[in-house]
UniProtKB/Swiss-Prot annotation:
Family: Belongs to the asparaginase 1 family. GatD subfamily.
Protein name per the record: Glutamyl-tRNA(Gln) amidotransferase subunit D
Highest taxon, organism lineage: Archaea
Reaction(s) catalysed (UniProt annotation): L-glutamyl-tRNA(Gln) + L-glutamine + ATP + H2O = L-glutaminyl-tRNA(Gln) + L-glutamate + ADP + phosphate + H(+)
Organism of this sequence: Aeropyrum pernix (strain ATCC 700893 / DSM 11879 / JCM 9820 / NBRC 100138 / K1)
EC primary class: ligase
Function comment: Allows the formation of correctly charged Gln-tRNA(Gln) through the transamidation of misacylated Glu-tRNA(Gln) in organisms which lack glutaminyl-tRNA synthetase. The reaction takes place in the presence of glutamine and ATP through an activated gamma-phospho-Glu-tRNA(Gln). The GatDE system is specific for glutamate and does not act on aspartate.
Amino acid sequence: MEVRRGDGSVFRGVLMPKHETSHPDTVVIKLGNGYNIGVLVGEGDDIVVKGSLRPGTPGALVPLLEEPLQPAEERVYIIGAGGTIASRVDYETGAVKPYLDASELATTIPELQRYASIEAEQLFSILSEDMKPSMWEAIVDRAARVLEAGYDGVVVAHGTDTMAFTASALSFAFHKGLPSPVILTGSQRSSDRPSSDAAFNLTASVLAASRAPFAEVAVVMHGETGDTYALAHRGVRVKKMHSSRRDAFQSVNDKPLARIYPFEGRVEMLRDDYRRRGESGLEVDNGFEERVALVKHFPGLISEVIDALLDRGFKGIVVEGTGFGHVSSDAIKSIERARDQGVPIVITTQTVFGRVNLNVYSTGRKMLAAGAIPAGDMTSEAAYAKLSWILARTRELEVVRKMFQRNLAGEVSERHILRLYRHIGGV
């Protein structure tokens, strides 16, 4: 359709439903560049209908290549687990909803075939806030079957908000042996938006899955706000550090594994202490305990929160303490109660960077005496997934403590390196 204004300006595009709060004389149009505008129609303006589209017609995901590519010899399997990368805007409500499946993503981004022959399936169609430990198990099972079938790598398309939890969980499930990369990726902006990062991230992920020399669980997302390179972060070391930026994901207390250049077809390793592709077979240790909680210490009723979780039968609790990992004096009594009930209390720090040290102040020493388990420099996401994984294998408190203090998948460092702290002060 066209809106022809009395001043001679013309707006062309597809008529979209308007929001319930829009002015009654406003027309919402999706322009050819993918952006929506609202045009206030008044006297002297004309609306010309040029044609119609069937509801559900795919939007901005348009193949960029005029001629089809010959698929590469490598084989990569894409597992769809929902999230923004497989979503689009619902123009009736203005909200982002799950819409596309993994096969649609693969077919609408033909550049993927430069690096691998693609097969895909949709395992879940959810937004990532609905992810659960039982779904981690399903992803592990499916990825394991794919790798057993001889694929060169696996890509899991996942929502970004809880991706670090899932990446950590998969890292522990595969920590005993992984022959090829398992890559998690997503997008900060839905696939039907012109500013979407879906195609770039998915292409970089397929490149990593098919040709990267490492055989680990990793998250591959934009490394900067442009479209130059993506970063591959070790699954147990990554965290989403910004709500909306393309380069929201960072490695915490650790270096990324690699830079991925999807337009050049190049993988630049940033470290050499990684598990090599093909040097080990597949060994899966799947299973997670769902009754694990993650709570943040705050000035107030933290002891009552811990007590309530114990009363409700939770099997383990991760507490984000302040600074070195401290909690209030009242909460120490709750840690003692948890120990007496055989429930592990793991301590991480709210500061994100740095490590838990309960040997500096008297509060920390009292916490250790009460039974708290320090998580070192683990992220809270990794600590949560690790505790969930351990509790699916044993409930004996001392065994849990010993297993938690073992470095299974590179989730903790023996010493802290100051230069790994990324200053984000803006100056």
